[in-house]
From Swiss-Prot:
Keywords: Cytoplasm, Hydrolase, Lipid degradation, Lipid metabolism, Membrane, Nucleus, Transferase, Transmembrane, Transmembrane helix. Belongs to the H-rev107 family. The active site is at residues 30, 119. It holds the Pfam family LRAT. This is Phospholipase A and acyltransferase 1. Its EC number is 2.3.1.-, 3.1.1.32, 3.1.1.4. PANTHER family: HRAS-LIKE SUPPRESSOR - RELATED, PHOSPHOLIPASE A AND ACYLTRANSFERASE 1. The keyword NADP does not apply. Gene3D superfamilies: endopeptidase domain like (from Nostoc punctiforme) (3.90.1720.10).
Length: 167
């Protein structure tokens, strides 16, 4: 999607129930699912770290709370777009089913993991019946590249080896 597909609440496009909402935070994207009448469902980490450290909070959290909130409150001063990017890969479930599936977990605590069970996994599971996260896959790929790079540097002897001291 083009950059001009992003918009803020000052230039609202009308999402439809069941749409995925991608919110652009300073260091990551947060995801929610539009329910209608201005409300979304999303998950937020709850592990006792101050909310001003939201991105750091999501890295260290193992639990999240399922919330139904106004879209404008979730977005705040950030920008967002409607992004049903997986529709060509996974057929969306009927809207009525998506909304029904969304109502059950509201207010519940759920397991959270930045790489395998994050906010994007949560909303795509509701929309498609399949939890997927391109953002998490990129992070996993980056971690793999860094680990492989360290292995190569170590193998080639580019990192200094510790000298054993003889006594």
């Amino acid at each position: 999607m083009a950059v001009n597909d992003c918009f803020s609440l000052t230039y609202p496009h009308n999402p439809h129930p069941g749409d995925l909402i991608e919110v652009f935070r300073p260091c990551y994207q947060h995801w929610a699912l539009y329910l209608g009448d201005g409300y979304v469902i999303n998950i937020a980490p709850i592990d006792g770290i101050r909310s001003s450290f939201t991105s750091a909070k999501s890295v260290f959290s193992t639990k999240a709370l399922v919330k139904m909130q106004l879209l404008k409150d979730v977005v705040g001063n950030d920008t967002y777009r409607i992004n049903n990017k997986y529709d060509t890969t996974y057929p969306p479930l009927p809207v009525e089913e998506v909304i029904q599936r969304s109502e059950f977990p509201i207010g519940q605590e759920v397991a959270y993991d930045l790489l395998v069970n994050n906010c994007e996994h949560f909303v795509t599971l509701l929309r498609y019946g399949e939890g997927v996260s391109e953002q998490a896959n990129r992070a996993i790929g980056t971690i793999g590249l860094v680990a492989a790079g360290i292995d190569i540097f170590t193998f080639l002897g580019l990192f200094p080896k510790r000298q054993r001291t003889k006594y």
